[in-house]
From Swiss-Prot:
Family: Belongs to the WRKY group II-c family.
Record's protein name: Probable WRKY transcription factor 50
Cell compartment(s), UniProt: Nucleus
Organism the protein comes from: Arabidopsis thaliana
SMART domains: WRKY
Amino acid sequence: MNDADTNLGSSFSDDTHSVFEFPELDLSDEWMDDDLVSAVSGMNQSYGYQTSDVAGALFSGSSSCFSHPESPSTKTYVAATATASADNQNKKEKKKIKGRVAFKTRSEVEVLDDGFKWRKYGKKMVKNSPHPRNYYKCSVDGCPVKKRVERDRDDPSFVITTYEGSHNHSSMN
């Protein structure tokens, strides 16, 4: 690492802008709360912004804090980071709007009949639990509801079902 790279890093960390804010952890459509996901999305996606527009908006009038001219790769990184940060803010706002309800039920079967049809889209092992978590989406086109089902860590005779969102249609029964 040369002195220019070191100065660039310290200039960013001393600035009041949070340029080094990283995107939230995310796995495609899955919603995770309590476990660490190893995939980071957002940095490889195109957000529809021109790199020069975003970099110019971020640094207009403040370029004097740099001791060297910005390279194109620096502008690209800053623009990608800024747009990823803005995208994550939108995800946080959407998450607040959705309702989340959890039920703990004693059951031999994992998927209980709740009056809706579900499509399984994922399964993963959860930290500190010997039982996998299963992910489902409502099978009606355009319905945003998701649910996850897992056995209780402490008492496997219980199933924890968590619903996120509200159905935009009536039940199937």
